[in-house]
Amino acid sequence: RWQVVDNDPLNRRFTTASRMEITGPLRGTDHVKTKYSTGGTHCRGTNNNCGNGYTPWGTYLTCEENWPGIFVNKGTRPEDQRRIGVGTSSGQYKWETAAGDSTEVADEFTRFDVTVKGASATDDYRNEASTYGYIVEIDPYNSSTLATKRTALGRFRHEGCAPGLPVAGKPLVWYMGDDSNNEYLYKWVSTAVWDAADANTANPLATGDKYLDKGTLYAARFKDDGSGEWMELSLDNPVI
């Protein structure tokens, strides 16, 4: 019979305030630099998660879905914020209204207002929303590790991350959906091929770096006859 062990060292809770690591192609880029992480390597929190997944090396994947609603931009929204649904009047929880309170710690509420306010991205939180919208990998067996945002698997309203069957010597595959109207199904194919020894890795998140940070993302395009094809989402693809 399952029973909760209240004080087990592996018990931990991830919230919208938890420190997390950014990996993959967006790590260290201008897209994710904020006042909190001027180098663009870390962020805070995961929110409105829905669906899940897992890896052959024993980590848990959680999917950030309806996260755009927690932010507000009262200025000029960039195209990605307009398309994905960041609001212009208030966040759905109005967390930004608690900014400036005497109990606020490290801009924990200020960051939900992504309006441009400073001279550069490292002076404000204009890029805070860009640190959300990812598959987040968690090592459930090591409570000292940070949750890791795998930016290579795409940024959208993630719903589920289902793995294909791992076959030694072949790339690993995960299938994902965007849980919004008229959106897409996605497939991630790792560059690295599966080594069955990695199922018993001593460092699960490093193994995640191997298979989840480098690869190819595809979107499904369906035809009227019910067939379809996978389109590579790359600037090297002339269709894109």
Residue ranges and their predicted role:
Residues R1-I240:
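Conserved small-residue
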